[in-house]
Amino acid sequence: VDYLVIHYTAVDLKDTLDIFMNPESCASSHLVIDTDGEIYELVDCLDGHVYRGWHAGVSEWEGVQGLNDCSIGIELVNYNGNVFPFTEAQYRSLQQVMARFKEHYPDLRDPERVLGHEHIAGFRGKADPGILFDWPRFYRENYQGLEAPCRPAVCPKALQESLLQLQKSEPELQTEKSQFWRSVSLLTETTIRLIAEAKTGS
């Protein structure tokens, strides 16, 4: 294991587990951490034996491509990390998980090896874990005494302000709420991808 990649789910816990437990989805993450801090291990990783997950997709970081081959993925249950803060319980569970990972996987003792999905796939519009993930807190709690790398969010502030307004349109029914925010996340990704393409002229 060379890297750890942090994501948000874009749907609630039930829909997250349904997606990752369905072989036809062609997606899997090693861990899911619910808003109450409950940790779900879907692909083995906590005991020092790790299997490949399918969470990174087409990805690149500092010349390394295809990070599914060399990373662990953690999904934090959150409809959109550019709209909703992550919970205290999730940060506490991240501390527990990080302690295990640093024990078993020496490369993860280096704070530079922890990334967001947006940092390895922002060119595809990925925007997680998002603006509201507290990277300084994460590094302070898990890498005390080590210099924390900069992990800027790819979501522009103007786009985030527009996303925040969508909370007023959120459906009341839980089943509809997940679908609504999943659609918002897809719209977020498309917008960020178009911005990236405009900057590169592609």
Q: What is each stretch, according to the model?
A:
Residues 2-108:
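Active-site-adjacent loop/helix surface patches within enzyme catalytic domains
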